[in-house]
Structure formats: structure tokens, C-alpha cells
Curated annotation (Swiss-Prot):
Disulfide cross-links: none
Keyword set includes Translocase: yes
Originating species: Stigmatella aurantiaca
Keyword Cell inner membrane among record annotations: yes
Protein family: Belongs to the ATPase alpha/beta chains family.
Lineage: Bacteria, Pseudomonadati, Myxococcota, Myxococcia, Myxococcales
Protein name: ATP synthase subunit beta
One GO MF term: ATP hydrolysis activity
């Protein structure tokens, strides 16, 4: 965005979160420019409300979208042109903090120490800067690494209802990236419940992911635009979080994890803004620019020659309709899907990832290697056979099965148990120390199980352990007890 002359305009109309501002001739701000106005109903500070230029109406008039409450504004009030887009603080000073859409701290722990700011509207990396190598991103979580591996610099969709463990899985990924890889995580709360955002922060403190005492050593940034915020804030908070992540990738060369909860709310906020600006709606009432807005966000999430931004996005599916334009547009950008299943969580298996529904673009022998691919497909085959046999077992019982099927069921139940794993962030609840399992150990363990090398061990030995050696040791203790 080119440098602009700082000018002062005046409010001519306020329609909810939409504000029309008139500027003197020759002083019209560009689209996406941030303007400042004083709203005494928010606080006593001057220029405390940020609004963003969305449209040029002609006659030196611009239409803007507010990032906070517009109650208390009046016609004729002065509006300052900042001459630049919304800028958010970036760098080490943001770690361990909670920010809002315009980069202000909302955790009551003083100002942000970072001296550098970046604009939230930025171009995607050019083809020359992108890293075209396809690489798996090791998470240390067995079920993900084996059956639905994540791509470095890729985009992952996380599907799951309330209470099946989405938040715990997100927190474990944050911990594993911080501990094992020294990487940073940025969490964008887009249109989520304030209570959930608050709970996440306090659970992170209990799980030692982000603590006030050690926030300088913390490796996580939280950026929130909750449900009660105006649509402008909810439509921009994902961009603010992404900008912070891009700084760590481009300037410090880190592998960054970006969590977005919930990407549907980003689309929903864009739809509200579009309607407020008077655009004619598209299919199902969504904005006509849906694909463009989603593409502008998603194309910035990628690997470059300096580092990577890998994104895990929780996706709400309206009325369970996968053909709805909002989730359908998101699916086009995803490299992997991790599906959390309530039926699995009811069995007490955590993480409750569905091994048959979760998919990955890189579960391919040319990317993950022939051994990994063969083991993953064999494990899925055994689990699929078990699923098909469950109706027979429910009606007739195990005794009616053939010897081969009995063996398949026994192995499948062990595999199902072995897909569980103790998490670092759940230590405070379970008392069991968390486990990070390396990919080679995961492949070896499941290979031995699928081949029947541990048919003599009890099922209980495979529940909530790390690698296969721990399961063997647990079986020895169970036998001795």
C-alpha cells in the first residue's frame, strides 16, 4: 500500500458497525486503510476506535467497517487517517500474550514490549519464495503421524463436536511443537465463545504452555475476536494472527503452527460485512467474494525457503451439510483432515481421532515411504474388517466367528488401544506422564502389531502407552501383578 497523506475527515452516517466518513478533496484514504476516531463509550482515551475503509462511495466519501462498538459516535465527529492499514505488533514481545484484532493486549499484563509492527493485509509469498518440497510434519501423536500425516506448511481441517477433545489435541500440538522443535504457535480465536477462550488460556497455564511467570520463555501467542465482537473484528482477527505467524516464519526462520478456531466464523463474519456493505448475496446468502476472501487467507499459509506456517483449522459444518458453500470452499484448500469421533471418546480412547475417516494428501508411498504407507494401509484394513464384523459380534457373539476373524478382531482391539496416547497437557488430570512418540517408533510398533508379533500380550498393555517397548513392559508388570 502506497504512502498516504494523513488527513482528517468527519462522520456523516453511522449504521451499526458501518460508518460513512467524508474527507476533504484530494485526501481520500485507500481501501483497507485504518482510520481512528474517539469513542468515549469504550474508554476515556483519544482515538480509541479503529475503523477500516471498505468502499469508496464517490463525492470524497468512504464507507468503513468498525473493529469495536460504535455506540456513542455522532455525525460530525473528527476521523483521523492513519495513512496505513491496521498494524499489529510482531516478534518475541507478543509471546505468552492475548491480543485483540488490532494488536492491543487484553490480558491485563501491561503493554506489548515489541517495537515492530506489520500490516495485516499482506501478499502471499511469490512462487520463487515458496518451498515446493513435500515434507511430512511430525507431531509426536501416533494416530496422526501414522494414518493422517500433516504436511509442513500445509492446511489441516479438524472436525469434531463439543467435548470430544479438540482443545486438548490443539494444546498437545502446541506443546510438542514447542518442546521438540523449538517452534512457535499462534492461536486465532475467530468468533468463538469468550468462555472457551478464557478456559483455553487457563488450561494452557495449568499445562505449562503459556504462563505469566515464564511468558518470555512461552512459545505461544493468542489472538481473539470473540462472538460478541462486531463482524469487522471477526473478519480480520484471522489475518492479525496470520501476520504474527508470518513474522516468525520470514524474519526468524521458524516452523510455526497456526490454529484457527473456527474458520467457519471467518466466513460468517465476511458474510455479515458483505451484507452491511450492500453487496448482492451469492448462494445460500453468502458473500459473492467468498472464494476470494478464503483464498487470500489460505494462500498466505505455506512453506517458504525460510520457514513454514502449518495451519490446523477447526471447521464447523452447518447442519452437517458438507455441500454448504462455507465448508465446501474450505475443503478445497485442505491437505489433511483429522476427524474426532464421539463414539471413540466414549470408549475412553484419547485422542478420539477416527482412524478410518481421517485422511491426508501425503499418505502416499512416494512421500512417506513404502514402509509407512504399507503399515498404515494394513492397520486401516484390520480396523475396517473389525468394523464390518461388529454387527455379527453384537448379534451372535464372538464364538460364531471363524478363527481368522477372531484373530483380526483381537489385533484390531489392540491396535485401537495402541492408538491412544498419554498427553503432556493432560498430566494434571490423569497423573500419567505425557509421551512424544517418534515416527520411526510409531511405524515399528504398528507393524509388529499388524503382523501378529504381540498376539500373546493382553489388550490392556497397549492402552495409554507411548511406543511398543512401553506396552511390552506394561504387559510384564500386569503378568507379575
Amino acid at each position: 500500500m502506497s504512502a498516504q497523506v494523513a488527513t482528517v475527515g468527519k462522520i456523516t452516517q453511522v449504521l451499526g458497525p458501518v460508518i460513512d466518513v467524508e474527507f476533504p478533496p484530494g485526501g481520500l484514504p485507500e481501501v483497507y486503510t485504518a482510520l481512528k476516531v474517539t469513542n468515549t463509550s469504550i474508554s476515556a482515551e483519544a482515538d480509541n476506535l479503529t475503523i477500516e475503509v471498505a468502499q469508496h462511495l464517490g463525492e470524497n466519501m468512504v464507507r468503513c467497517i468498525s473493529m469495536d462498538s460504535t455506540e456513542g459516535l455522532a455525525r460530525g465527529q473528527a476521523v483521523k487517517n492513519t495513512g496505513a492499514p491496521i498494524q499489529v505488533p510482531v516478534g518475541q514481545g507478543t509471546l505468552g500474550r492475548i491480543l485483540n484484532v488490532i494488536g492491543e493486549p487484553v490480558d491485563e499484563r501491561g503493554p506489548i514490549t515489541s517495537s515492530q509492527t506489520w500490516p495485516i493485509h499482506r501478499p502471499a509469498p511469490t512462487f520463487v519464495d515458496q518451498d515446493v518440497r513435500v515434507q511430512a510434519f511430525e507431531t509426536g501423536i501416533k494416530v496422526i503421524d501414522l494414518l493422517g500425516p500433516y504436511t509442513r506448511g500445509g492446511k489441516i481441517g479438524l472436525f469434531g463436536g463439543a467435548g470430544v477433545g479438540k482443545t486438548v489435541l490443539l494444546m498437545e500440538l502446541i506443546v510438542n511443537v514447542a518442546k521438540e522443535r523449538g517452534g512457535f504457535s499462534v492461536f486465532a480465536g475467530v468468533g468463538e465463545r469468550t468462555r472457551e477462550g478464557n478456559d483455553l488460556y487457563h488450561e494452557m497455564q495449568e499445562g505449562n504452555v503459556s504462563t505469566p511467570r515464564t511468558w518470555m520463555e512461552s512459545q505461544c501467542v493468542l489472538v481473539y475476536g470473540q462472538m460478541n465482537e462486531p463482524p469487522g473484528a471477526r473478519a480480520r482477527v484471522a489475518l492479525s494472527a496470520l501476520t504474527i505467524a508470518e513474522y516468525f516464519r520470514d524474519m526468524e526462520g521458524h516452523d510455526v503452527l497456526l490454529f484457527v478456531d473456527n474458520i467457519f466464523r471467518f466466513t460468517q463474519a465476511g458474510s455479515e460485512v458483505s451484507a452491511l456493505l450492500g453487496r448482492i448475496p451469492s448462494a445460500v446468502g453468502y458473500q459473492p467474494t467468498l472464494s476470494t476472501e478464503m483464498g487470500a487467507l489460505q494462500e498466505r499459509i505455506t512453506s517458504t525457503t525460510k520457514g513454514s506456517v502449518t495451519s490446523v483449522q477447526a471447521i464447523y459444518v452447518p447442519a452437517d451439510d458438507l455441500t454448504d458453500p462455507a465448508p465446501a470452499t474450505t475443503f478445497a484448500h485442505l491437505d489433511a483432515t483429522t476427524v474426532l469421533n464421539r463414539a471413540i471418546s466414549e470408549l475412553g480412547i484419547y485422542p478420539a481421532v477416527d482412524p478410518l475417516d481421517s485422511t491426508s494428501r501425503i499418505l502416499d508411498p512416494n512421500v512417506v515411504g513404502p514402509e509407512h504407507y504399507a503399515v498404515a494401509r494394513k492397520v486401516q484394513g484390520i480396523l475396517q474388517k473389525y468394523k464390518e464384523l461388529q454387527d455379527i459380534i453384537a448379534i451372535l457373539g464372538m464364538d460364531e466367528l471363524s478363527e481368522t476373524d477372531k484373530l483380526t478382531v483381537a489385533r484390531a482391539r489392540k491396535i485401537q488401544k495402541f492408538l491412544s496416547q498419554p498427553f503432556h497437557v493432560a498430566e494434571v488430570f490423569t497423573g500419567a506422564p505425557g509421551r512424544y512418540v517418534e515416527l520411526k517408533d510409531t511405524i515399528q510398533g504398528f507393524k509388529e502389531l499388524a503382523e501378529g508379533k504381540h498376539d500373546d500380550l493382553p489388550e490392556a498393555a497397549f492402552y495409554m502407552v507411548g511406543n511398543i517397548n512401553e506396552a511390552i513392559e506394561k504387559a510384564r508388570k500386569l503378568a507379575a501383578a
